[in-house]
From Swiss-Prot:
GO terms for cellular component: bacterial nucleoid; cytoplasm. Keywords: Cytoplasm. HAMAP family: NdpA (MF_00730). The lineage of its organism: Bacteria, Pseudomonadati, Pseudomonadota, Gammaproteobacteria, Pasteurellales. PANTHER family: NUCLEOID-ASSOCIATED PROTEIN YEJK, PTHR38772. The keyword Phosphoprotein does not apply. It comes from Haemophilus influenzae (strain PittGG). Belongs to the YejK family. This is Nucleoid-associated protein CGSHiGG_07705. InterPro entries: Nucleoid_associated_NdpA (IPR007358). It is found in: Cytoplasm, Nucleoid.
Length: 338
């Protein structure tokens, strides 16, 4: 699949330190980049890399300055270059409040992918390396790192314009622990948290469990339904698609003459029609897992009360029939002790 780059520009943010004072200065390009095959290939790589990142959803606050200028851009009141220059200065002012941010190249690109318009914004690092020139001499070079980036956001312009009540038109990369990347980028955009995929996935799991309970299913039947839900969600995840609530409901058995989607609506679970799947959360549909105090356990839910017994009084698990590789390790350890 390819993308269509409509407008793209690069600006630089340079960090200047004067004693305890930190200032981010912007070096602005005075014209847009020409859209060449190299530029399109770069944006395709950035698009694919962003798709694989862990992201959070956001929405613009009512007084967002960035959103006001974005709206002027979409209404064709200002040009993309002017919008990008203003946004760069706005980000520079915000970055000056943090001491962990370094210099970088800011890329702003308006592109189309699968009939959807996007605005992509990312702060990219530069890396130093070596190259061999035509005379076979070694020279130092500097290149833009488009494979590793964690300061980026993307706005679904199509969704923003078509659905004013959407809570997922803006996504941004979740910051690493100990760094407030998400914080300053949200402040720069004038945005706040929108859809929470983790909460949506957890509510979906609870709804499935409650649906089975109200249908008075036995253990085996409940596990079969949960496995069916998991297989559907896993398929959506593998294909890069969201969980479609009505589509999922159509694939499940109707319990007490009530489809699953109707049950979720009547019980007010607050589920979206389209839910971004989270693999780690969905695994609990078919597995029990946990770790702590040097122990990590994971096993299929159907094994509980068959091969695996839990005694809540003594807080112990009894496993009948260890995995061969684990058993082999234990036997070797026992022999070495003797």
């Amino acid at each position: 699949m390819s993308i269509t780059v409509n407008q793209i520009v690069l600006h630089q943010l340079v960090k200047n330190v004067d004693g305890d004072s930190i200032k981010m200065e912007s070096v602005l390009r005075d014209e847009l980049l020409s859209i060449t095959p190299e530029v399109e290939q770069m944006m395709l790589q950035l698009h694919q890399g962003y798709q694989n990142k862990a992201k959070a959803f956001g929405v613009f606050q009512e007084k967002s300055i960035f959103a006001q200028h974005l709206n002027r851009l979409l209404e064709q009141e200002i040009e993309f270059l002017g919008f990008s220059q203003y946004s760069t200065k706005l980000l520079a002012d915000e970055l000056g409040k943090y001491n962990f941010v370094e210099s970088g190249t800011l890329i702003l690109c308006q592109y189309n992918f699968l009939a959807t318009d996007y605005l992509f914004i990312a702060l990219l690092d530069s890396r130093h390396s070596m190259l061999v020139d035509e005379h076979l001499d070694i020279r130092r070079t500097e290149y833009l790192d488009i494979t590793q980036f964690d300061i980026a956001a993307r706005i679904n312009l199509t969704d923003l314009q078509v659905n004013a009540n959407s809570n997922r038109y803006l996504t941004f990369i979740k910051g690493r622990v100990g760094r407030k990347i998400s914080d300053f980028f949200m402040d720069f955009l004038g945005a706040e948290e929108g859809l929470n995929p983790q909460v949506q996935n957890q509510c979906l799991l609870q709804a499935v469990s409650d649906y089975c309970d109200q249908g008075e299913l036995n253990k085996e039947q409940t596990q079969a339904v949960k496995k069916q839900v998991f297989e559907y969600c896993k398929g959506q995840l593998s294909n890069g698609n969201n969980i479609k609530l009505r589509e999922l409901s159509d694939s499940l058995p109707t319990l007490n003459e009530q489809p699953f989607v109707v049950f979720t609506e009547e019980q007010n679970y607050g589920l979206e029609e389209s839910i971004p799947p989270i693999r780690s959360t969905l695994k609990s549909l078919t597995k029990f897992s946990g770790s702590g105090k040097g122990v990590t356990l994971s096993f299929d839910a159907e094994l509980l009360n068959t091969r695996i017994q839990w005694d809540p009084m003594t807080d112990t698990l009894t496993i009948k029939g260890l995995p061969p590789n684990l058993k082999d390790q234990l036997q070797k350890a026992l022999k070495s002790e003797n």
